Regions:
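ATP-dependent carboxylate-amine ligase
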Residues: 1-135
Length: 135
């Protein structure tokens, strides 16, 4: 587990933005589900290089995300966006999708987050490691 805890001027971050596969996502989300905070959210990037298992793996992570107690979950990348179709409309309301990290950065610049505990988890290729400086 290469996660790093960082407290910024505005938020508390758990950063694990360099590696993501199904088992590491499970571990990170299970751990995050145990945390108590009034304003929990996650920013999850696609898991890369999963091949034929990708659709099922991303759908499984979405189901797990529903159990973490988060108020919102931002999804970055096309695999998570496709997986959203496996959820009901009520379930999908928790999630917000972004094409790439640049879209997330634009949102954070327009609408900064404050007083959140945020898990940032995704494959290195999703470039989520660029986000902490904006949080």
């Amino acid at each position: 587990n290469r996660s790093e805890y960082r407290k910024t001027q505005h938020n508390r971050l758990i950063i694990d933005a360099y590696n993501a596969n199904l088992s590491s996502m499970h571990a990170a989300l299970h751990s995050f589900a145990q945390t108590e905070d009034a304003h929990k959210m996650m920013i999850l990037g696609d898991m890369r290089e999963l091949g034929a298992a990708s659709a099922d793996a991303h759908a499984e992570v979405l189901q797990l995300a529903l159990t973490t107690g988060c108020q919102q979950v931002w999804l970055v990348g096309s695999e998570f966006t496709k997986a959203l179709t496996t959820l009901s409309a009520d379930q999908a309301a928790l999630f917000r999708t972004f094409a790439d990290v640049e879209a997330v950065k634009a949102e954070l610049e327009a609408n900064p987050l404050n007083d959140h505990l945020i898990l940032i988890k995704g494959s290195n290729g999703t470039r989520l490691f660029q986000l902490p400086e904006l949080l």
